[in-house]
């Protein structure tokens, strides 16, 4: 029987954190991925992490008190769903985990100069100090494994294969007005042109792709084995401990031994049958999770009487999503996170042609509002010609890009008047005119008394700081007018397997199942269906991935009784 010390099921950030840490502790590691490419949701994410009091924050004079972040989390999560053991472990070990992974070269982050928590006016919130940005990475370091790295969706790439980060996006928006930005963009384009001579896409990686590529490079160099296209059929249990897995690969079934433990890091159930059961019913819903995130960990762990998290009012991390339907039947999904909703000259209206939410609040808040009333989903994001020229709208890029193909495909609507736009969208023209007129009167003064768009530091950070008197508000005046349809969507699941502070999966009696761990979206999120800030999934994923491997390295193996 083939054997390793640790078997990791899944290849996202949490799984790689466990794998790298285990390798560094002298343990042998096998990573199993169901898909033909590795990286999971993490590889197509923004890659940011939300961790308190990191070395990066301390260097910039932004050290964070543990009491402050705990107060903030308890306020947002609520007393009933707040788990002090898990929160304490995250707060106490987040900095340690990140520093360890950085020391080993597995991650590299910088402090975002301005990245407010999503509820900046609540007790314990900060405008800077917790959110970290992934430093770009050269994908060529992966060698032949670069082709196995999951690529972001086409809509998140420029020119068919170039990745950009938040800073790059700002430079592209400014390049017609700034020589510095023009120079920055020219260098990116030159690098990309060179890459395409020998690679299927750009090798300058950003965001979640940079995170996973860097972690994979280090893990593989430290001896981790990575298998793709593997289906895990069941867990092997011996004398009350998980000691291996039964798999199917290339039509052959095999049993593999895990001497120290198995880590479930398979990405949750956002793409599986469980999703419909735990999701509010809306007309259409689109997940950004890969198809392989089908709840495999739940199926595997349920056979061992594992405890699942409570069914909350929100079991997902929500986001509004637009969908481009290609002529060949393909669907291209775009999550509306930071590029358009908060910008001046952009509003959202529901089926009654009425605004229903502060458009510049977080994507989780926005999509939650879409689900609050039947008429709010799907909804429409609307802007005027000036906003389109400056910021774009979803997959529609700002000037000088030609977006006619998106209009022909029915993704982007364009009309020379609001009345004609309403007709295209199936809205009441008089109601839409009244909504826009009301918004315009207030926006001209930089105000939004109806929904307070631009009313807090997070809103303004997502807007356009050059636009005054408010970074988020400007009247919609200049024709043509544009619109796209937004559907409810998600970035992954919040509900998962209940664990200990060391990421051990607990059984129904709330006792650890020896040798079984869960991290990432397979772990019941301590956020309990809330979304306090940027990177609140990946921060805990790295932390508890690290803690799971550290715990395994300290335990006697079930087979020998000796500490590895």
Language model features with spans:
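Short, well-ordered coil/turn residues at beta-beta hairpins
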Residues: 10, 248, 258-259, 264-266, ...
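Conserved N-terminal/central alpha/beta ligand/cofactor-binding core
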Residues: 34-225, 346-348, 355, 386-388, ...
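An anion/pyrophosphate-binding glycine-rich loop and adjacent beta-alpha core
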Residues: 120, 128, 135-184, 298-302, ...
């Amino acid at each position: 029987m083939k054997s390793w010390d640790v078997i990791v099921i899944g290849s996202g950030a949490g799984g790689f954190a466990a794998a790298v840490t285990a390798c560094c502790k002298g343990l042998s590691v096998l990573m199993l991925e169901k898909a033909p490419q590795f990286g999971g949701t993490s590889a197509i994410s923004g890659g940011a992490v939300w961790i308190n009091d990191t070395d990066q924050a301390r260097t910039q004079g932004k050290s964070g008190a543990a009491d402050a972040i705990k107060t903030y989390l308890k306020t947002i999560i609520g007393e009933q769903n707040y788990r002090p053991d898990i929160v304490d472990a995250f707060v106490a070990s987040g900095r340690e985990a990140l520093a360890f992974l950085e020391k080993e070269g597995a991650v590299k982050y910088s402090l975002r100069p301005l990245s407010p928590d999503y509820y900046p006016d609540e007790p314990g919130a900060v405008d800077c100090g917790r959110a970290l940005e992934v430093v770009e990475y050269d994908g060529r370091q992966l060698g032949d494994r670069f082709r196995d790295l999951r690529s972001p969706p086409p809509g998140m790439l420029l020119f068919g294969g170039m990745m950009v980060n938040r800073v790059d996006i700002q430079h592209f928006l400014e390049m017609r007005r700034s020589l510095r930005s023009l120079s920055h963009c020219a260098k990116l384009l030159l690098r990309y042109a060179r890459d395409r001579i020998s690679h299927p896409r750009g090798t300058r990686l950003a965001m979640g792709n940079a995170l996973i590529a860097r972690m994979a490079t280090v893990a593989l160099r430290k001896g981790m084995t990575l298998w793709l296209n593997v289906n895990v059929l069941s867990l092997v249990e011996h004398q009350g401990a998980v000691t291996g897995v039964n798999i199917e690969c290339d039509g052959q079934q095999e049993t593999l031994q895990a001497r120290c433990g198995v880590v479930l890091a398979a990405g949750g159930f956002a793409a599986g049958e469980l999703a419909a059961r735990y999701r509010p019913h809306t007309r259409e819903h689109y997940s950004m999770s890969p198809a392989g995130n089908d709840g495999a960990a739940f199926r595997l762990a349920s056979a061992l009487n594992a405890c699942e998290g409570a069914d909350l009012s929100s079991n997902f991390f929500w986001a509004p999503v637009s969908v481009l339907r290609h002529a060949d039947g393909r669907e291209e999904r775009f999550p509306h996170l930071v590029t358009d909703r908060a910008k001046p000259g952009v509003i959202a209206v529901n089926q009654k042609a009425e605004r229903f939410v502060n458009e510049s609040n977080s994507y989780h808040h926005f999509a939650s509002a879409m689900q609050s009333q039947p008429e709010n989903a799907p909804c429409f994001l609307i802007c005027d010609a000036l906003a389109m020229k400056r910021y774009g709208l979803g997959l529609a890029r700002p000037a000088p890009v030609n977006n006619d193909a998106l209009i022909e495909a029915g993704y982007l609507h364009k009309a020379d008047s609001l009345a004609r736009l309403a007709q295209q969208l199936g809205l009441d023209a008089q109601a839409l005119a009244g909504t826009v007129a009301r918004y315009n009167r207030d926006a001209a003064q930089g105000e939004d008394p109806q929904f307070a768009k631009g009313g807090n530091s997070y809103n303004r950070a997502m807007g356009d700081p050059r636009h005054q008197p408010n970074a988020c508000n400007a009247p919609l005046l200049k024709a043509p007018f544009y619109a796209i349809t937004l559907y409810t969507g998600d970035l992954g699941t919040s509900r998962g397997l209940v664990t200990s502070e060391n990421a051990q999966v607990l059984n129904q009696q709330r006792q650890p199942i020896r040798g079984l761990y869960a991290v990432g979206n397979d772990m019941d999120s301590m956020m309990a269906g809330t979304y306090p800030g940027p990177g609140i999934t990946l921060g805990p994923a790295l932390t508890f991935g690290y803690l799971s491997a550290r715990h395994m390295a300290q335990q006697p193996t079930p087979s020998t009784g000796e500490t590895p």
